[in-house]
């Protein structure tokens, strides 16, 4: 039987599992990569494993996408993963190319015990500010989850008035597999929304810039003015300057 190379191994892992994998049927480079990946992902389970050892089962990661853009909503996700989950190449969404994020999002949705998405639009961001909008989106995502969450691992910030115990982790999307999964779902959902907005307002090229303040986007903003989904509190300074 011909041994699986690295590309074939990754495809197998996306659609199968470690349990049904014959390690002797891997090329040396594929086996070396897999050993490194297993070690990396086990390190990303550090916080989850500590909580499992305390007898908890439903641990959720929470993260957001869209605090920085000039346009559109802030999107949060909340994800509970199984204890023995192995998703190759899962990481902070910002470290992954778009195509990889899309593929990983499909796997996460399929393998997750439960997940939720929360969205707060640009109008509300202008009304309550981006931090409060982010917290509101996170709460929405948490309450969308079907299982009873026992503990929250949150990227960087603490969520006030939350009846569930939580731990904010700085750069949590790189340190916790649950937060990484949430970061990917939030980013993929927000990118999908921005592609839809691009169809309505193609002059700003939202499909490419996703609403961030690129040079091209700012030039279009100055040329055409803001559209209905621009965050007024963000673009006023740019237009005045």
UniProtKB/Swiss-Prot annotation:
Domain RNase H type-2, chain residue ranges per copy: 57-241
GO biological process: DNA replication, removal of RNA primer; mismatch repair
EC assignment: 3.1.26.4
Cofactor binding, note field: Manganese or magnesium. Binds 1 divalent metal ion per monomer in the absence of substrate. May bind a second metal ion after substrate binding.
Cofactor(s) for this UniProt protein: Mn(2+); Mg(2+)
Main location (coarse class): cytoplasm
Keywords: Cytoplasm, Endonuclease, Hydrolase, Manganese, Metal-binding, Nuclease
Locations listed in the record: Cytoplasm
GO CC, one annotated term: cytoplasm
Source organism, top-level taxon: Bacteria
Chain sites annotated for binding a divalent metal cation: 63-64, 155
Reaction(s) the record says it catalyses: Endonucleolytic cleavage to 5'-phosphomonoester
Coiled-coil region(s): none
InterPro entries (alphabetical): RNase_HII (IPR022898), RNase_HII/HIII (IPR001352), RNase_HII/HIII_dom (IPR024567), RNaseH-like_sf (IPR012337), RNaseH_sf (IPR036397)
GO terms assigned for molecular function: manganese ion binding; RNA binding; RNA-DNA hybrid ribonuclease activity
Family, as annotated: Belongs to the RNase HII family.
Job of this protein: Endonuclease that specifically degrades the RNA of RNA-DNA hybrids.
Name this polypeptide is given: Ribonuclease HII
Gene: rnhB
């Amino acid at each position: 039987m011909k041994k699986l190379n690295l590309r074939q191994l990754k495809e197998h892992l996306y659609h199968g599992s470690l349990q049904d994998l014959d390690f002797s049927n891997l090329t040396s480079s594929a086996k070396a990569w897999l050993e490194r990946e297993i070690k990396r992902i086990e390190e990303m389970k550090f916080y989850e494993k500590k909580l499992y050892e305390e007898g908890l089962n439903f641990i959720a990661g929470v993260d957001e996408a869209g605090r920085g853009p000039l346009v559109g909503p802030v999107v949060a996700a909340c994800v509970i993963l199984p204890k023995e989950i192995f998703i190759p190449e899962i990481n902070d969404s910002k470290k992954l190319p778009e195509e990889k994020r899309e593929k990983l999002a499909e796997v996460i949705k399929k393998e997750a015990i439960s997940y939720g998405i929360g969205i707060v639009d640009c109008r509300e961001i202008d009304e309550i500010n981006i931090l409060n909008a982010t917290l509101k989106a996170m709460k929405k995502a948490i309450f969308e989850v079907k299982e009873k969450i026992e503990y929250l691992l949150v990227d960087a910030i603490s969520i006030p008035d939350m009846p569930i115990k939580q731990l904010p982790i700085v750069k949590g999307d790189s340190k916790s597999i649950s937060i990484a999964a949430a970061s990917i779902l939030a980013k993929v959902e927000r990118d999908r929304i921005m592609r839809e907005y691009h169809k309505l307002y193609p002059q700003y090229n939202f499909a490419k810039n996703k609403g961030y303040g690129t040079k091209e986007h700012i030039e279009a903003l100055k040329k055409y003015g803001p559209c209905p989904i621009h965050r007024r509190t963000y673009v006023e300074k740019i237009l005045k300057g």
